[in-house]
Amino acid sequence: MKTVLQSKDTAIHPVLYMAMELSHKKWKLGFSNGKKNRIRTIDARDWPALLAEIELAKSKLSCAIDCKMLSCYEAGRDGFWIHRALIAEGIENQVLDSASIEVSRRKKQVKTDRVDVLALLRLLIRYIGGEKQALRVIRIPTVAEEDDRRLNRERERLLKERGAHRARMKSLLVTHGIVLEKLAEVPRILAKAKAAVIGYELPPDLKSELEREYQRYELVNSQVRELERLQIERAESQDIPAMQKIQHLRGLKGVGWQSSWILTMEFFNWREFKNSKQVGACAGLTPTPYDSGDKTREQGISKAGNKRIRQLMVELAWLWLRYQPDSDLSLWFERRFGSGGKRMRRIGIVALARKLLVALWRYLEHGVIPQGAVLKGV
């Protein structure tokens, strides 16, 4: 009987890979030297514990103390502070688009943090090995670029909140037969209005609720106006590239303050596009054909990009038809979809939105005014 001794891996590996599966309470860490894996769990946001596990993994997986380290995690609620902290530690980190991660097509699949972190490790190793299609890496904005988006996003939330207060007041009054035409009428209604037909006094608790609802509406409305004033003040007073782009976009007839602000802060300010295909794809406005066997059809746009930009561009496309009727884009739309029904025009407006977004990108990056477009004041 022969005794076979198991060989030991005594080589010093030059690279240590780390994948992170993040949750609110725990972080699952996966380490690999390309041959052997190590899985550990730490408390969420416990940075000293993370650094200690990294040093221990280097020892356990036979990696040099100063070996090159590559890591990744999925983009999510934790934002980019982890990425910035890893970079500060000298670790090359990649933040992954969750939608690009491969998943099993089985009807039922195992779903645990351990399975997920091992899958991320395999994808990271494939990506670093040259298989760039294994996953999609997202571009990270700077802290300042991230902060630039706060004003328009806060305004977006406040507008929804203001609409909810308005709808609530109208709903409360209509249950007593009173139709509210203007919100400025609420104080007068509370003072002397009576229910329709029967004419009884409005109940006291209803009046109290309406008073509080109106106060909340006025507060939100004042905050919206303050944000809009601040946006205009910054755009007119600050001589920085982002504000210059806003002013440049506003020069086109049909493009207003909010459209130019959102397009700049959410899209054009910090993203780098190499060609028009990347512009359309980032907004999720590119087509997704289905062509398999004898079946060929269009599945609509991908909707894989920035939802705010996609919604804005559809609205802006309708405004473009109204304010720039003699532009080449508007004339193209009328030739292709002008004689069609409502459904065809809705399809066409998405195509126009994609073309318009590309035209605005060329206008900002290369100074090319969209063909036939009119500038304000001309």
Question: What residue ranges belong to the model's regions?
Answer:
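Gly/Thr-rich phosphate-binding beta-strand-loop-beta motif of the actin/hexokinase/Hsp70
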Residues: 7-32, 120
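Nucleic-acid-processing active sites and adjacent nucleic-acid-binding tracks
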Residues: 32-68
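Short glycine-rich phosphate-binding loop at a beta-alpha junction
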Residues: 66-76
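Short alpha-helix plus adjacent loop in nuclease-associated cores
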Residues: 94-137, 192-193, 295-304
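Glycine-rich, often acidic, oxyanion-interacting loops/wings at catalytic, nucleic-acid
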Residues: 152-248
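Phosphate-backbone recognition surface of nucleic-acid-processing proteins
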Residues: 245-251, 257-345
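Low-complexity, acidic/Ser/Thr- and charged residue-rich accessory regions of DNA metabolism proteins
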Residues: 294, 333-378
